[in-house]
Amino acid sequence: MRTIVRSQFCLIAVCLVLGWLAAQMFPVGQSGAQRPASPPTKEQPPKHANAPVFPMQARLGANIYLQTSGEYRACCQMIYRSAADRLTAIVAEQPKSEKPLAVVLDLDETVFDNSAFQTFLYRNNLEYTDELWSLYERDHARDVTLIPGAKAFLEKVHELGVTPVLLSNRLQLNQAGSLAALEHLGIKVGDPAKELFLKVSATESNKTARREQVAGMYNVVMFIGDNLRDFSEAEFAAKKPPQGAGLEWYVEEIRRRQTEADKAAEHWGRDWFILPNPVYGEWDKLVGPDPLSLMHPTTMKAPEVKPAQK
């Protein structure tokens, strides 16, 4: 069993590396040369205050990877298959409990594929804003598709007599839109008060209180998400950079989160399962003003260009 779990963990790690590599890609022109994102112009509005650090154009490679690659689909299918197999074993081994068993899942980029929202931003030359996202949550349920493997996993959860609890940072104000998306995708939700936990405030991103609420109602045996904060806040939430933070601060905070992820190794592939998301997440709060300085060093040097022979 340890060998199986260890191999599952290694496969998942490979998926996350693939996702990270995709996130490093920049738009590629017809000549194949990399181009940086264009500066804001009258036609291209400046980034909103609540927008992520990377501009949309710098995320293009990651979005293309998520929307078009078979590798991403294979990753998600593999992770959900591993989670289903592990849950089957947990249920078989689990002693009787007064509280019903539950699996806690995030929604966006864990169950819901929101590629349509990303496409909307690109086609309209827009950056992310909370207001645009709220409109998408509320009014565009039919644009939402499924993350590969999610529906089959949820069906297995029900088959095993376990309750899937959806814990998301979508707005409670837009609950009807989220329920409509779930219905559109054919995902069963019982009593929303017991199985769908959304955030009340637009500024609330910490899930700890809601996780504790769920733990009071259920015997939670598994968590699934696409962001480390879907598993624990204290260890994985990125700290806010102090004013004037330099490269050293960003490197230290990145290493802290990486170390915490390594410390949680006994959870990965056992009761915590994470899906790749190279488009957005806690990680992109720490890219700093010079992302290239955070990348692995290299000993390679560009070849010298020899002058043309006359």
Q: Which ranges hold each PLM region?
A:
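Bacterial N-terminal signal peptides that target proteins for export
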Residues: 2-12
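Second-shell loop/turn segments in exported
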Residues: 65-74, 138-144, 165-171, 200-201
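Asp-based phosphoryl-transfer active-site loop
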Residues: 103-113
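C-terminal cap/substrate-recognition subdomain and adjoining C-terminal extension
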Residues: 171, 175-310
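Conserved phosphoryl-transfer catalytic core
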Residues: 126-138
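Non-catalytic pre-domain segments flanking phosphatase-related domains
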Residues: 23-105, 287-310
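Substrate-recognition element of Asp-dependent hydrolases with the DxDx(T/V) motif
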Residues: 109, 150-182, 226
